[in-house]
């Protein structure tokens, strides 16, 4: 899995559960792509498909995010610590339109709008699950 360095987006990330029981997660569905597992470095993207876009509606927050499909790989970098994790897109989410005014800051720079959700395995690679939200840069 190649992880790129070309800037794609920036915003907030949170974490979510999918697939088999693992860590803080009980067993749940395997996501829009049918492959999502909490124990693997995976993510949910709000413009996975047109149906996904219509539900997550990032445009309501002024986010015109590019379409990236199931199996696409992106590199997520914690804005504060510089820690990175390479993830495979495996689900639709987060529901960006619900978080338009939310922001997370560090080092005097704030990121707004939840633009990617990470599985617990991926989120733990760049921050503590207890933090709940992290400001991130996304590369491909």
Predicted regions and their residues:
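Secreted/periplasmic proteins
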Residues: 1-140
């Amino acid at each position: 899995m190649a992880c790129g360095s070309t800037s794609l987006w920036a915003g907030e990330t949170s974490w979510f559960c999918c697939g088999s029981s693992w860590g803080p997660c009980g067993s749940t569905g395997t996501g829009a792509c049918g492959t999502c597992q909490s124990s693997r470095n995976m993510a949910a993207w709000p413009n996975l498909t047109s149906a996904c876009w219509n539900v997550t509606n990032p445009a309501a927050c002024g986010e015109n995010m590019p379409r990236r499909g199931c199996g696409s790989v992106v590199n997520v970098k914690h804005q504060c610590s510089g820690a990175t994790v390479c993830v495979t897109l495996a689900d639709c989410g987060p529901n960006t339109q619900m978080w338009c005014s939310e922001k997370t800051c560090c080092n005097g720079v704030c990121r707004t709008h939840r633009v990617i959700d990470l599985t617990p395995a991926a989120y733990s690679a760049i921050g503590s699950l207890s933090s709940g939200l992290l400001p991130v840069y996304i590369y491909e």
